[in-house]
């Protein structure tokens, strides 16, 4: 998967799309490119990888923040892995009656650049009623405390949803939900 992600980045025409992904302001969410990314293989850049005029400050391979959001359907390598019977069995084993793949991403943790991703719940961004969104995270390289591994709050999935990322006209906005006791 890592080799395939590197190949996709190498083949990506960075001149065609220079959308910066930022977990801080979510300004990327207003772009048509982001809004259509659910049905595509789309590339998003790190904030520090481009200057104010959109020129690259880093090598293309070190400028990518993430690739998303339909790798599982549109790329044969990711599709073979994502649609593997083991994932379906795992999903059913944790109680999913009808597991569906809705989104896939490669999140690149670039050295020395990259914004902090605040604590969040995946259902903030992929909401279902009832709340049944479950994310599977696969490390494509060693993840340690020193290099910024993902953290999880034990039992956090039982605490109730705190925020939702919802459509707002042509873009998106974050709303805070009622406090959960």
Annotated model-derived regions:
Residues 1-117:
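Non-heme Fe(II)-dependent double-stranded beta-helix
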Residues 21-27, 129-130, 176-177:
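Short alpha-helical linear motifs
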Residues 91, 95, 120, 126-145:
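Short, conserved beta-strand element in jelly-roll/cupin
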Residues 100, 119, 125, 132, ...:
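Catalytic-core "active-site belt" of small-molecule-metabolizing enzymes
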Residues 111, 128-130, 162:
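Short, function-defining helix-loop hinge/capping sites that tune catalysis or transport
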Residues 143-181:
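Double-stranded beta-helix
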